[in-house]
Amino acid sequence: MKLAFMGTPDFSVPVLAEILAAGHEVVAVYSQPPRKAGRGMAEQPSPVHRFAEEHGIPVFTPVSLKGEAEQQAFASLDLDVAVVVAYGLILPKPVLEAPRLGCLNLHASLLPRWRGAAPIQRAIMAGDAETGVMVMQMEEGLDTGPVLLAERVAIAPDETAGGLHDRLSHIGASLMVRALAALSRGGLAAAPQPEEGVTYARKIEKAEARIDWRRPANELDCHIRGLTPFPGAFFEIARGGETIRVKILRAKPVAKSGEPGKVLDAGESIIIACGEGALEISGLQRAGKAAVTARDFLRGFALKPGESVA
Protein backbone atom coordinates (compact mmCIF):
# COMPACT_ATOMS: atom_id res chain seq x y z
CA MET A 1 0.00 0.00 0.00
CA LYS A 2 1.00 3.61 -0.51
CA LEU A 3 1.52 5.16 2.90
CA ALA A 4 3.15 7.84 5.02
CA PHE A 5 4.89 7.01 8.28
CA MET A 6 4.68 9.48 11.17
CA GLY A 7 7.00 8.88 14.13
CA THR A 8 9.89 10.35 16.06
CA PRO A 9 11.76 8.30 18.74
CA ASP A 10 13.68 5.01 18.78
CA PHE A 11 10.46 3.13 19.57
CA SER A 12 9.13 3.96 16.10
CA VAL A 13 12.13 2.83 14.04
CA PRO A 14 11.54 -0.97 14.09
CA VAL A 15 7.96 -0.37 12.94
CA LEU A 16 9.10 1.63 9.92
CA ALA A 17 11.77 -0.98 9.18
CA GLU A 18 9.21 -3.82 9.22
CA ILE A 19 6.84 -1.86 6.98
CA LEU A 20 9.59 -1.34 4.42
CA ALA A 21 10.63 -5.01 4.63
CA ALA A 22 7.01 -6.01 3.95
CA GLY A 23 7.17 -4.18 0.62
CA HIS A 24 4.86 -1.25 1.29
CA GLU A 25 5.43 1.99 -0.61
CA VAL A 26 6.45 4.59 1.99
CA VAL A 27 6.30 7.87 0.06
CA ALA A 28 6.88 10.21 3.00
CA VAL A 29 8.03 10.22 6.60
CA TYR A 30 6.85 12.85 9.06
CA SER A 31 8.91 13.42 12.20
CA GLN A 32 9.34 16.15 14.78
CA PRO A 33 11.83 18.90 13.89
CA PRO A 34 15.52 18.45 14.82
CA ARG A 35 16.29 19.29 18.45
CA LYS A 36 19.45 20.67 20.03
CA ALA A 37 21.28 17.90 21.88
CA GLY A 38 24.73 16.74 22.96
CA ARG A 39 27.65 18.66 24.38
CA GLY A 40 27.79 21.09 21.48
CA MET A 41 23.99 21.55 21.50
CA ALA A 42 23.92 21.04 17.75
CA GLU A 43 20.58 20.31 16.13
CA GLN A 44 20.04 16.55 15.85
CA PRO A 45 17.42 14.86 13.66
CA SER A 46 15.17 12.31 15.34
CA PRO A 47 15.93 8.56 15.11
CA VAL A 48 13.07 8.14 12.61
CA HIS A 49 14.34 11.09 10.57
CA ARG A 50 17.83 9.58 10.36
CA PHE A 51 16.51 6.12 9.43
CA ALA A 52 14.29 7.55 6.68
CA GLU A 53 17.13 9.57 5.16
CA GLU A 54 19.37 6.48 5.17
CA HIS A 55 16.69 4.69 3.16
CA GLY A 56 16.06 7.53 0.72
CA ILE A 57 12.58 8.43 1.95
CA PRO A 58 11.53 12.12 1.84
CA VAL A 59 11.26 13.55 5.36
CA PHE A 60 8.95 16.35 6.50
CA THR A 61 9.37 18.04 9.88
CA PRO A 62 6.58 20.59 10.38
CA VAL A 63 6.25 22.19 13.81
CA SER A 64 2.48 21.79 13.48
CA LEU A 65 -0.11 20.26 11.17
CA LYS A 66 -2.81 22.78 12.04
CA GLY A 67 -2.11 25.10 9.09
CA GLU A 68 -4.01 24.77 5.83
CA ALA A 69 -0.82 24.63 3.75
CA GLU A 70 0.55 21.65 5.70
CA GLN A 71 -2.80 19.88 5.51
CA GLN A 72 -3.02 20.38 1.75
CA ALA A 73 0.54 19.11 1.31
CA PHE A 74 -0.34 15.98 3.28
CA ALA A 75 -3.56 15.43 1.30
CA SER A 76 -1.65 15.80 -1.98
CA LEU A 77 0.34 12.64 -1.15
CA ASP A 78 -2.80 10.69 -2.13
CA LEU A 79 -2.22 7.99 0.49
CA ASP A 80 -3.94 4.69 1.09
CA VAL A 81 -3.15 4.95 4.80
CA ALA A 82 -0.90 6.73 7.31
CA VAL A 83 0.87 4.87 10.13
CA VAL A 84 1.46 6.86 13.32
CA VAL A 85 3.86 5.64 16.02
CA ALA A 86 4.88 8.04 18.81
CA TYR A 87 4.87 11.02 16.46
CA GLY A 88 4.27 13.63 19.15
CA LEU A 89 2.11 16.07 17.19
CA ILE A 90 -1.68 16.35 17.20
CA LEU A 91 -3.29 15.28 13.93
CA PRO A 92 -6.22 17.58 13.04
CA LYS A 93 -9.35 16.14 11.45
CA PRO A 94 -8.35 17.04 7.85
CA VAL A 95 -5.11 15.06 8.29
CA LEU A 96 -6.89 12.09 9.88
CA GLU A 97 -9.35 11.96 7.00
CA ALA A 98 -6.91 12.55 4.12
CA PRO A 99 -5.71 8.95 3.55
CA ARG A 100 -8.22 6.65 1.81
CA LEU A 101 -8.21 4.22 4.77
CA GLY A 102 -7.49 6.77 7.49
CA CYS A 103 -4.65 6.75 10.02
CA LEU A 104 -3.51 3.76 12.08
CA ASN A 105 -1.78 4.26 15.42
CA LEU A 106 0.37 1.80 17.36
CA HIS A 107 -0.05 2.32 21.11
CA ALA A 108 1.97 0.54 23.80
CA SER A 109 -0.74 -0.42 26.27
CA LEU A 110 -3.95 -2.42 26.61
CA LEU A 111 -6.39 0.37 25.86
CA PRO A 112 -8.33 1.98 27.41
CA ARG A 113 -5.77 1.54 30.21
CA TRP A 114 -2.88 3.99 29.94
CA ARG A 115 -4.00 6.33 27.23
CA GLY A 116 -1.49 9.12 26.77
CA ALA A 117 2.21 9.92 26.69
CA ALA A 118 3.97 7.40 28.96
CA PRO A 119 2.11 4.05 28.89
CA ILE A 120 5.20 1.83 29.25
CA GLN A 121 6.55 3.64 32.31
CA ARG A 122 3.16 3.97 33.97
CA ALA A 123 2.32 0.28 33.56
CA ILE A 124 5.50 -0.75 35.40
CA MET A 125 5.22 2.00 38.01
CA ALA A 126 1.68 0.86 38.81
CA GLY A 127 2.80 -2.75 39.27
CA ASP A 128 0.76 -4.08 36.33
CA ALA A 129 1.33 -7.77 35.63
CA GLU A 130 0.77 -7.34 31.91
CA THR A 131 0.53 -4.75 29.19
CA GLY A 132 0.50 -4.96 25.41
CA VAL A 133 0.43 -3.22 22.07
CA MET A 134 -2.60 -2.25 20.04
CA VAL A 135 -3.24 -0.99 16.54
CA MET A 136 -6.16 1.40 16.49
CA GLN A 137 -7.97 3.52 13.94
CA MET A 138 -7.26 7.10 14.89
CA GLU A 139 -9.93 9.66 15.68
CA GLU A 140 -9.77 13.12 17.20
CA GLY A 141 -9.79 11.99 20.87
CA LEU A 142 -6.62 11.05 22.78
CA ASP A 143 -6.07 7.33 22.09
CA THR A 144 -9.83 6.74 21.93
CA GLY A 145 -10.15 5.07 18.52
CA PRO A 146 -11.48 1.57 17.86
CA VAL A 147 -8.97 -1.28 18.18
CA LEU A 148 -8.04 -3.30 15.09
CA LEU A 149 -5.41 -5.69 16.48
CA ALA A 150 -3.92 -6.31 19.93
CA GLU A 151 -1.28 -8.46 21.58
CA ARG A 152 -0.97 -8.96 25.34
CA VAL A 153 2.49 -9.08 26.93
CA ALA A 154 3.45 -10.19 30.45
CA ILE A 155 5.68 -7.80 32.41
CA ALA A 156 8.57 -9.68 34.02
CA PRO A 157 9.08 -9.06 37.78
CA ASP A 158 12.49 -7.45 37.17
CA GLU A 159 11.69 -5.72 33.87
CA THR A 160 12.62 -2.07 33.38
CA ALA A 161 10.90 0.48 31.19
CA GLY A 162 13.88 0.33 28.83
CA GLY A 163 13.65 -3.42 28.39
CA LEU A 164 9.88 -3.40 27.97
CA HIS A 165 10.15 -0.50 25.53
CA ASP A 166 12.43 -2.53 23.26
CA ARG A 167 10.25 -5.66 23.46
CA LEU A 168 7.03 -3.81 22.69
CA SER A 169 8.63 -1.91 19.83
CA HIS A 170 9.46 -5.14 17.98
CA ILE A 171 6.20 -6.88 18.88
CA GLY A 172 4.34 -3.78 17.74
CA ALA A 173 6.23 -3.69 14.46
CA SER A 174 5.03 -7.19 13.57
CA LEU A 175 1.50 -6.33 14.71
CA MET A 176 1.37 -3.25 12.48
CA VAL A 177 2.53 -5.22 9.44
CA ARG A 178 -0.21 -7.78 10.13
CA ALA A 179 -2.75 -4.97 10.39
CA LEU A 180 -1.67 -3.43 7.08
CA ALA A 181 -1.87 -6.82 5.34
CA ALA A 182 -5.38 -7.42 6.67
CA LEU A 183 -6.43 -3.87 5.84
CA SER A 184 -5.28 -4.26 2.23
CA ARG A 185 -7.51 -7.35 1.94
CA GLY A 186 -10.46 -5.56 3.54
CA GLY A 187 -10.60 -8.04 6.41
CA LEU A 188 -9.88 -5.93 9.48
CA ALA A 189 -12.74 -5.42 11.95
CA ALA A 190 -12.68 -2.54 14.43
CA ALA A 191 -13.81 -3.02 18.03
CA PRO A 192 -14.73 0.04 20.13
CA GLN A 193 -12.76 0.49 23.33
CA PRO A 194 -14.59 -0.33 26.58
CA GLU A 195 -16.00 2.67 28.42
CA GLU A 196 -14.80 1.33 31.77
CA GLY A 197 -11.18 0.97 32.88
CA VAL A 198 -9.91 4.22 31.37
CA THR A 199 -6.63 5.48 32.88
CA TYR A 200 -4.22 8.15 31.64
CA ALA A 201 -0.46 7.78 31.36
CA ARG A 202 0.57 11.35 32.01
CA LYS A 203 4.04 12.49 31.01
CA ILE A 204 6.78 11.66 33.53
CA GLU A 205 7.63 14.71 35.63
CA LYS A 206 11.13 15.39 37.01
CA ALA A 207 9.78 15.55 40.56
CA GLU A 208 8.70 11.90 40.32
CA ALA A 209 12.30 10.75 39.98
CA ARG A 210 13.17 11.48 43.63
CA ILE A 211 12.64 8.40 45.80
CA ASP A 212 10.25 8.76 48.73
CA TRP A 213 11.57 6.25 51.26
CA ARG A 214 8.30 6.40 53.19
CA ARG A 215 6.67 4.26 50.50
CA PRO A 216 6.66 0.43 50.70
CA ALA A 217 9.66 -1.32 49.16
CA ASN A 218 7.55 -3.22 46.62
CA GLU A 219 6.07 0.06 45.35
CA LEU A 220 9.51 1.65 45.12
CA ASP A 221 10.79 -1.36 43.19
CA CYS A 222 8.10 -0.76 40.54
CA HIS A 223 8.76 2.98 40.64
CA ILE A 224 12.49 2.55 40.05
CA ARG A 225 12.05 0.03 37.23
CA GLY A 226 9.48 2.27 35.57
CA LEU A 227 11.95 5.17 35.53
CA THR A 228 14.93 3.12 34.29
CA PRO A 229 16.87 4.10 32.24
CA PHE A 230 15.29 7.54 31.91
CA PRO A 231 14.99 9.77 33.81
CA GLY A 232 16.24 7.41 36.52
CA ALA A 233 15.03 7.28 40.13
CA PHE A 234 17.46 8.90 42.56
CA PHE A 235 18.23 9.63 46.19
CA GLU A 236 20.63 12.15 47.71
CA ILE A 237 23.41 11.92 50.28
CA ALA A 238 24.70 14.90 52.26
CA ARG A 239 28.50 15.09 52.51
CA GLY A 240 30.37 18.04 54.06
CA GLY A 241 27.97 20.67 52.83
CA GLU A 242 27.62 18.99 49.43
CA THR A 243 24.57 17.09 48.19
CA ILE A 244 25.39 14.07 46.05
CA ARG A 245 22.73 12.64 43.76
CA VAL A 246 22.73 8.90 43.11
CA LYS A 247 20.53 6.99 40.65
CA ILE A 248 19.40 3.48 41.49
CA LEU A 249 19.79 1.18 38.49
CA ARG A 250 19.05 -2.23 40.04
CA ALA A 251 17.28 -3.04 43.29
CA LYS A 252 14.89 -5.56 44.81
CA PRO A 253 12.62 -5.60 47.88
CA VAL A 254 13.87 -7.52 50.93
CA ALA A 255 12.25 -8.42 54.25
CA LYS A 256 14.11 -6.02 56.54
CA SER A 257 12.84 -3.02 58.44
CA GLY A 258 14.01 0.24 59.90
CA GLU A 259 13.46 3.97 59.80
CA PRO A 260 12.65 5.00 56.21
CA GLY A 261 15.76 6.26 54.42
CA LYS A 262 18.20 4.69 56.89
CA VAL A 263 21.06 2.52 55.60
CA LEU A 264 20.74 -0.97 57.11
CA ASP A 265 23.70 -2.60 55.38
CA ALA A 266 26.57 -1.47 53.15
CA GLY A 267 28.69 -4.41 51.98
CA GLU A 268 28.17 -6.48 48.85
CA SER A 269 24.98 -4.49 48.37
CA ILE A 270 23.35 -1.45 49.95
CA ILE A 271 20.15 -2.01 51.90
CA ILE A 272 17.98 1.00 52.72
CA ALA A 273 14.84 0.85 54.86
CA CYS A 274 11.51 1.88 53.36
CA GLY A 275 8.08 2.62 54.82
CA GLU A 276 7.48 -1.12 54.65
CA GLY A 277 10.37 -3.54 54.05
CA ALA A 278 13.65 -2.42 52.51
CA LEU A 279 15.41 -2.15 49.15
CA GLU A 280 18.58 -4.07 48.40
CA ILE A 281 20.47 -1.98 45.85
CA SER A 282 23.00 -3.66 43.57
CA GLY A 283 23.55 -1.07 40.81
CA LEU A 284 23.99 2.70 41.14
CA GLN A 285 25.23 5.75 39.26
CA ARG A 286 26.45 9.06 40.66
CA ALA A 287 25.65 12.16 38.62
CA GLY A 288 28.25 12.52 35.88
CA LYS A 289 29.84 9.14 36.66
CA ALA A 290 29.70 5.67 35.14
CA ALA A 291 27.26 3.02 36.35
CA VAL A 292 28.80 0.71 38.98
CA THR A 293 27.91 -2.18 41.25
CA ALA A 294 27.08 -1.43 44.88
CA ARG A 295 30.39 -2.96 45.92
CA ASP A 296 32.39 -0.71 43.59
CA PHE A 297 30.34 2.30 44.65
CA LEU A 298 31.24 1.66 48.29
CA ARG A 299 34.93 1.41 47.44
CA GLY A 300 34.90 5.04 46.37
CA PHE A 301 32.20 6.36 48.66
CA ALA A 302 31.91 5.60 52.35
CA LEU A 303 28.31 4.82 53.24
CA LYS A 304 27.76 3.29 56.66
CA PRO A 305 24.87 1.48 58.36
CA GLY A 306 22.84 3.93 60.41
CA GLU A 307 23.39 6.78 57.98
CA SER A 308 20.30 8.37 56.42
CA VAL A 309 19.72 9.29 52.79
CA ALA A 310 17.09 11.60 51.35
Swiss-Prot record:
Record field: catalytic activity: L-methionyl-tRNA(fMet) + (6R)-10-formyltetrahydrofolate = N-formyl-L-methionyl-tRNA(fMet) + (6S)-5,6,7,8-tetrahydrofolate + H(+)
Any coiled-coil regions, as ranges: none
Keyword Glycosyltransferase: no
CDD domains the UniProt entry points to: FMT_core_Met-tRNA-FMT_N, Met_tRNA_FMT_C
Binding site for (6S)-5,6,7,8-tetrahydrofolate: 109-112
Keyword entries, A-Z: Protein biosynthesis, Transferase
Gene Ontology, cellular component aspect: cytosol
An annotated Gene Ontology molecular function: methionyl-tRNA formyltransferase activity
Transferase in keyword set: yes
InterPro entries from the UniProt entry: Fmt (IPR005794), Formyl_trans_C (IPR005793), Formyl_transf_N (IPR002376), Formyl_transf_N_sf (IPR036477), Formyl_transferase-like_C_sf (IPR011034), GART_AS (IPR001555), Met-tRNA-FMT_C (IPR044135), Met-tRNA-FMT_N (IPR041711)
EC nos: 2.1.2.9
Classification via Pfam families: Formyl_trans_C, Formyl_trans_N
Functional summary from the UniProt entry: Attaches a formyl group to the free amino group of methionyl-tRNA(fMet). The formyl group appears to play a dual role in the initiator identity of N-formylmethionyl-tRNA by promoting its recognition by IF2 and preventing the misappropriation of this tRNA by the elongation apparatus.
Family that this chain belongs to: Belongs to the Fmt family.
Name of the featured protein: Methionyl-tRNA formyltransferase
Origin species: Parvibaculum lavamentivorans (strain DS-1 / DSM 13023 / NCIMB 13966)
Record gene name: fmt
